[in-house]
Design a protein with these regions (language model features):
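Short, structured segments at the rim of ligand-binding sites
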Residues: 1-433
Length: 433
């Protein structure tokens, strides 16, 4: 298996962050549901986005990909749809994209025709129990292989009341919010318990609004009222920069050298924008300069982070916390055990190989700061965020960090190693016998 050796050293410089994967998924799905031709600019063809584009084609849309004339090195995608779901390819490969699967399951049920969803890697065993329990009572025949993919679906989704726990992936709620407005009657979604990852649900509602779809909800997002018989209109939009991916470079700026990031929306609805508050609370200096975010190191101090609203930030934040004097705590992150890897175990295992002092508990991590990391061979766990976190850690290592499974970044951020090099990263691919 090939691995990547990263030589230690201070990193600094300027990058143009890649577009938001979360927003791109939502724009692409809304374009499928809208009548006419929608143009979505500033797209990077990560594996996850390829999966969602392929699903749109399977459900009746045509997809054309061109080079962007506005965003250098990026793509513009033109999605033409009749605004109605029709199954033209009965098997949809979701790759390893949980977002694709959780959005497509309810959206595909806007028609009665049978469809089968397949996946790869860990996605095959990731839980879809929420839909498995909800949909059979709403007109959908749902089958799987002992709780695993492939998932078979047949029948048209019915309007009505949907009750969902707030501590599950918000993608289940977003998927229903995308489908229910197109049914013949009104629906409601009731959330039991506090809604985690609330910003992602608000992003879904905002994206639907751009296509002419309205969703009413209570202030605490415990109740959503969805009028039926709505129609989505095609439109042209550009994807804003990705705060989830920028988080790794915000941490890099906090622990290594000054990093400048272009392409971010300061007022974004993306929940992971909270990374700025987190690195500032750790002692980093941040400033906006003519639309560019600049992060530089300060005197680091330990923190306590509630990850219930920003679970994707945990791998990056853990790297910074491992270098903060004293004890840091990351809590309410139990859903990370069901991601592309068990991220709590992965972070604990791999950072400890680099000399960190990380303890894992049921829903989080307790981290005792060290002065620096040590060189070692580490495993990326076939998880893009684990690989990127380990790469950032190398900037404060006393020896080379060698990552196996480094290719996992293609899932969400195929430009990552290019941007890492722009900041001075010295990387060398190794081939094992």
């Amino acid at each position: 298996m090939p691995s990547l050796r990263i030589e230690p050293g201070k990193l600094s410089g300027r990058i143009f962050i890649q577009p938001s994967k979360s927003m791109a998924h939502r724009l692409v799905l809304c374009a499928l549901l809208a009548e006419g031709a929608s143009e979505i600019d500033n797209i990077v063809l990560s594996d996850d986005i390829k999966a969602t584009l392929g699903a749109c084609e399977s459900l009746g849309a045509s997809v054309r990909i061109e080079d962007s004339t506005v965003f250098s090195g990026r793509k513009r995608v033109i999605i033409t749809s009749k605004g109605q779901i029709r199954v033209v390819k009965p098997v949809i490969d979701c790759f390893e994209s949980g977002t694709t699967a959780r959005f497509i399951i309810p959206v595909s049920r806007l028609c009665a025709d049978p469809v089968t969803l397949t996946g790869r890697g860990r996605l095959v065993t990731r839980p879809f129990d929420i839909y498995k329990s909800l949909l059979p009572g709403k007109g959908v025949n749902y089958t799987d292989e002992g709780g695993k993919m492939p998932i078979g679906l047949e029948g048209r989704l019915m309007p009505g009341d949907y009750d969902i726990r707030g501590d599950v992936s918000s993608q289940f709620i977003s998927g229903l919010l995308m489908a229910l407005p197109f049914l013949d009657e009104d629906s409601r979604i009731r959330i039991t318990g506090p809604l985690e990852s609330r910003p992602y649900v608000k992003m879904t509602i905002d994206t639907l609004k751009r296509f002419g779809i309205t969703i009413e909800h209570s202030e605490d997002c415990s109740m959503f009222r969805i009028s039926g018989r709505q129609k989505a209109a095609a439109c042209s939009l550009a994807v804003e920069g990705d705060w989830s991916q920028a988080a790794f470079f915000c941490v890099l700026g906090a622990i290594s050298g000054e990093v400048s990031i272009d392409g971010l929306n300061r007022d974004s609805l993306q929940g992971d924008r909270i990374i700025l508050d987190i690195v500032r609370s750790m002692g980093a200096r941040t400033v906006w300069n003519n639309g560019t975010l600049e992060i530089s190191p300060g005197t680091l101090n330990s923190i306590c982070v509630d990850a219930s609203q920003c679970p994707d930030l945990v791998p990056a934040v853990a790297v910074a916390a491992a270098l903060c004097p004293g004890e840091s705590v990351i809590k309410n992150a139990q859903r990370l055990r069901l991601k592309e890897s068990d991220r709590l175990s992965a972070v604990c295992s791999e950072l400890n190989k680099l000399g960190a002092r990380v303890e894992e508990n049921r829903d989080g991590l307790v981290i005792h700061g060290v002065e620096h990391f040590t060189g070692a061979g580490v495993d990326g766990w076939n998880d893009h965020r684990i690989v990127m976190a380990l790469a950032i850690a190398s900037s404060r290592s006393t020896g080379p960090v060698e990552i196996s499974g480094f290719e996992a970044v293609s899932k969400s951020y195929p430009e990552f190693w290019q941007d890492f090099r722009l900041l001075g990263g010295r990387i060398y691919e190794q081939h094992m016998g």
